[in-house]
Swiss-Prot record:
Its cofactor is Mg(2+). It catalyses: tRNA(Lys) + L-lysine + ATP = L-lysyl-tRNA(Lys) + AMP + diphosphate. Pfam families: tRNA-synt_2, tRNA_anti-codon. This is Lysine--tRNA ligase. Keywords: Aminoacyl-tRNA synthetase, ATP-binding, Cytoplasm, Ligase, Magnesium, Metal-binding, Nucleotide-binding, Protein biosynthesis. Disulfide bonds: none annotated. It comes from Actinobacillus succinogenes (strain ATCC 55618 / DSM 22257 / CCUG 43843 / 130Z). NCBIfam families: lysS_bact, PRK00484.1. The gene is lysS. Homodimer.
Length: 503
């Protein structure tokens, strides 16, 4: 018999024993009570009493009620040391026969298993090894776990199981719990920042008749009552700008977007973004906002502006570098033979891109080719926080053209560690120019570009009523969480990432 077969037999055998224990509990009455009320978390008790010596603790005689999942147990005759885990951390229990009502230890405590959830009332004391411990006077089994924990000693190591059964990952891995606490702090910190700046939080449609606001392939669904196809939104941008037209001069939305595209360590089809718009501001103001926000998040979450990530350390305390797309291509592409003239002529740009092994789409103009060259030769070099600016108008259909060079836009992308974290620009508020750019996107879509934008006539109508000078930005929450949690994959910071169906 193989080791795997032995393991499966042990697993099913243990489950059978646990089911028998649950049946015995049911026979006694309520097997899943909901009357226990705890008054302390493990971490709070450690913070309050870890530095208190045993004699002082004995004098104070603090009474506590704690609850959590049994993670370890060590029986010693008529007493058992148990470690329970709650949302804040772990604490040790001392459960002894002599401290409990007659029969409770033998009949109840001895039947407890790893993974069970228990409630304990007792007195805090220090063991001989100076470990803070709860001496139990009252005990109650709150939930009988029928399935054993996956690995009693090494945690949950299988990556796919961690993603599919995140609850087991959170039980077993302290680092995973820390990651999602950091994610929560990122979201809370962003919300606090924008509300403090006078922005109002809004919600815009997830189901849209016309998906807009980004170049991406949407998910399609059908609304039965209206009998129309609809799309999960790829971005909230066009709705948020309608609100600025309506007089909400500072708005933000923190919510989900959906893009029917590939899955990678950086991409999940369902992801979270903060998108905000500020009237009477330009893209320079938003770059300043972004620096200030990320500096604040680093200090609040990590206590420093130095952010470690893999082999790198990012310094959020210094001003972020700002470089145009053309300058970045020339700076990092020179060793591959890229010269200035290649960036201003379509045929030369195509020839340079082809030498780099870039597959050129028929619908691409000069701007798209230059952008592809940038992605090939320069993007991965933008390690320290860097704002890439002056994107071609062709690839920025919603951004305002630059006053001095209308071939490029007043746009920026924030790169950290060679990855795009955010995208923002001074908004295009010329309704006629916007209509023309939508038409160009329609032509690109007709030519085979699946990610080209749809035309939104209602949005053009809104612009015709007058959009004040405005700038807007979107920041990827998942990628920020990766950054602050030092997580290598986007799946590590999404509680339930998209996975193939398991047969």
């Amino acid at each position: 018999m193989s080791e795997q077969q032995n393991t499966e037999l042990d697993f099913h055998g243990e489950m059978a024993v646990r089911r028998e224990k649950l049946a015995a509990l049911r026979a006694k009455g309520n097997a899943f009570p909901n009357t226990f009320r705890r008054d302390a978390l493990a971490q709070d008790l450690h913070h309050q009493y870890d530095e208190t010596d045993g004699e002082q603790l004995k004098e104070k005689n603090p009474q506590v009620a704690v609850a959590g999942r049994i993670m370890t147990r060590r029986a010693m005759g008529k007493a058992t040391f148990i470690t329970i885990q709650d949302m804040s951390g772990k604490i040790q229990l001392y459960v002894a026969c002599d401290n409990l009502p007659e029969g409770v230890y033998a009949e109840d405590v001895k039947s407890w298993d790893l993974g069970d959830i228990v409630g304990i009332k007792g007195t805090l004391f220090k063991t001989k090894t100076n470990e803070l411990t709860v001496k139990a006077h009252e005990v109650q089994l709150l939930t009988k776990a029928l399935r054993p924990l996956p690995d009693k000693f090494h945690g949950l190591s299988d990556q796919e199981t961690r993603y599919r059964q995140r609850y087991l990952d959170l039980i077993s891995n302290e680092e995973s719990r820390r990651t999602f606490v950091i994610r929560s702090k990122v979201i809370a910190g962003i919300r606090e920042y924008f509300i403090g700046k006078g922005f109002i939080e809004v919600e815009t449609p997830m189901l849209q008749v016309i998906p807009g606001g980004a170049a991406a392939r949407p998910f399609v669904t059908h609304h039965n009552a209206l009998d129309i196809d609809m799309y999960l939104r790829i971005a909230p941008e066009l709705y948020l700008k309608r609100l600025v037209v309506g007089g909400f001069e500072r708005v933000f939305e923190l919510n989900r977007n959906f893009r029917n595209e590939g899955v990678s360590v950086r991409h999940n089809p369902e992801f979270t973004m903060i998108e905000y718009y500020q009237a009477y501001a330009d893209y320079h103001d938003l770059m300043d906002n972004t620096e200030e926000l990320l500096r604040k998040l680093a200090l609040d979450i990590l206590g420093t502006t130095i952010v470690p990530y893999g082999e790198y350390e990012f310094d959020f305390g210094k001003p972020f570098e700002r470089i145009t797309m053309h300058d970045a291509v020339l700076k990092y592409g020179a060793e591959k033979g890229i010269v200035k003239e290649d960036l201003y002529d379509l045929e030369r740009a195509k020839a340079a891109a082809t030498k780099l092994g870039i597959e050129i789409q028929k619908s691409w103009g000069l701007g798209s080719v230059v952008n592809a060259i940038f992605e090939e030769v320069a993007e991965h070099h933008l390690i320290q926080p860097t704002f890439l600016t002056a994107h071609p108008a062709e690839i920025s259909p919603l951004a305002r053209r630059n006053d001095e060079n209308p071939e490029v836009t007043d746009r920026f992308e924030l790169f950290i560690g060679g990855r795009e974290i955010g995208n923002g620009f001074s908004e295009l508020n010329d309704a006629e120019d916007q209509a023309e750019r939508f038409d160009a996107q329609v032509a690109a879509k007709d030519a085979g570009d699946d990610e080209a934008m749809f035309k939104d006539d209602d949005f053009v109508t809104a612009l015709e009523h007058g959009l004040p000078p405005t700038a807007g930005e979107g920041l990827g929450i998942d990628r920020l969480a990766m950054l602050f949690a030092n997580a290598p994959s986007i799946r590590d910071v999404i509680l339930f990432p998209a996975m193939k169906h398991k047969a």
